[in-house]
UniProtKB/Swiss-Prot annotation:
Protein known as: Heterogeneous nuclear rnp K-like protein 2
Organism classification: Eukaryota, Fungi, Dikarya, Ascomycota, Saccharomycotina
GO CC annotations on file: chromosome, telomeric region; nucleus; P-body
Gene: HEK2
Organism in which the protein naturally occurs: Vanderwaltozyma polyspora (strain ATCC 22028 / DSM 70294 / BCRC 21397 / CBS 2163 / NBRC 10782 / NRRL Y-8283 / UCD 57-17)
Keyword Magnesium annotated: no
Highest rank taxon of the organism: Eukaryota
Amino acid sequence: MSDSDSENKQTTTTATSVTQRLLLSLKEAAKIIGTKGTKIQKVRDDNNVKIGISERKERCSDRILICTGSIEDVSNAIGDICEILLSEDVVTNDEDSNEKENDEYNSIEDEKFVYPFLNFRLAKPTLDEVNDAETLKKIINIRVLVTRAQCSAIIGTKGDRIKSLIENRGVRMIASNQTLPDSDERLLEIQGTSMAITKVLEDINAVISNEVRATREKRYVPHVRRRNQPVSTNTSSNTGSSKSFDEEFKSIVKIPEAYVGAIVGRQGNRIANLRKYSKTKIVIEKRASEVSDDAERIFEIISNDIKNVELAESMLKKNLETEIQRRKEMEETESA
């Protein structure tokens, strides 16, 4: 990067005003707010940003964090938010969230949500991948809301830009194919340390500021689903279904990208037979333009009979276990 490019980027990061939006679970929101709003106020004061979290709505499982300021200040503020989420202190008596003291705040990242967009797709790396236990503890996932135009700019031509961001900043990223309900916004999931996320957000916001014009794309707003909207999807590994007004049941099974082909089968024959046998509809999430083998794809099971959903879920998981074991045995045989 030339001196002039560096100067231009520095000017952009300090002068341009941007707004960053994150999708949060209720527990994440409560932890960020802190007792009587002390934590979010500290982020606001330390970084000279306007930051707030959308109102909590009854029967709604998500909230939106909105942060506005210079690119540098906003990116640093989100880095501080990551540090709050990584901290192990327990939220108590939060007037805004009405959450009771609960050790579950210490395992936010491991929680499974009924609302599918809250579930992270990038699995946390293993110690073997990171090679440092302390660094592993500092890795976190966040969900950044981006419009279609912004997402296209971030991905770049043939995915070149997102590849460069991943390599240069030491993060992992994946963009969802689906837009959030009643909106034109998608999720950009970012995984890394707080510092790495801060740096990559500076790059991302500079790209958006320089290349994306203001559009009329509809922003996502947390809301309770209407009667004619799809039923909430169950993501719990032990099933417990969601029941809609027309008696429709849904469940989600996440399959690692490396195993999707085997689960679907040649020309889709294996998944077709599973659909037929279980009498369910199984919708497979489209493959993202940039995805690693350890990322996961969503298999959504739908039926008006809960037993059929449970059967299909059980069969999918069994097929995955069988394929994992088969590959393990092949590796052992080849290395023998």
